[in-house]
Amino acid sequence: MVKVSICVPAYKNPVGVERLLESIKVQSFTDYEVVVTDDSPDGSVEEVVRRAEVPGIVYVRNAVRKGATGNWNEAVRHASGEYIKIMHHDDWFTDRDCLARFVEMLEEHPEADLAFCGSRQVMLDGVGNRTGEEFDRAISDEHLKMISEDWRDLYIGDYIGAPSATIYRKGAPEYEEKLTWIVDVEFYMRLLQRNPRFVVSKEPFVSIGVSENQLTE
């Protein structure tokens, strides 16, 4: 069993998928597999995956479209790793040690099932290229105290952030496919209901691509 399954639910974003895979290839932590589940109607993502030459990559072309959340779950179903690391196709690791830092959080805190970090919000244009505008975002001390004392305060706001900013232990519940919005928040709440312990770093281990093409920012 590998330590980490990097799960990439992809849909029609070859530019983003290529950038993400390139960021994975240079990671200093190498005990991982990459699972790409492709919900695209064409072969553009598959072509990128085939030429990327990423070690330990598993490519799955969905025979029937799963939809956004269904594709998240499909990627996790194919995962064999001890830890699940969702990475959306708009996002990428900020530097070569970021996957190692994610793993360290759970390795050093066996009592926790969930860990999350800050993020670098990077503006993208209509075709997925960086515009040059970016800023870092992380949970505030006030909000960290709130959800540490009561995870139900996530009802007020998504203080954890995008799924790409998280890592969790295999065996977590699936994402709720009946929802269109706040899918990630609802998932975090069910995960913390089972085990309210979590680990956090305010450092931006991931860069989140922000564009008008996203389902949510």
PLM ranges: what are they?
Residues 1-23:
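N-proximal low-complexity "stem/linker" segments adjacent to membrane-targeting elements
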Residues 2-5, 33, 186:
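Cell-envelope/extracellular polymer assembly enzymes that use nucleotide-activated donors
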Residues 117, 139-217:
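Conserved nucleotide-sugar donor-binding catalytic segment
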Residues 22-31:
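Short, acidic, metal-binding catalytic loop of nucleotide-sugar glycosyltransferases
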Residues 84:
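Short aromatic/hydrophobic "clamp" motif used to bind/position activated sugar donors
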Residues 30, 38-46, 64, 88:
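A conserved acidic beta->alpha catalytic loop
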Residues 62-79, 92:
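Glycine-rich, basic loop-to-helix element that forms the pyrophosphate-binding segment
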Residues 97-132:
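Conserved donor NDP-sugar-binding/catalytic core segment of glycosyltransferases
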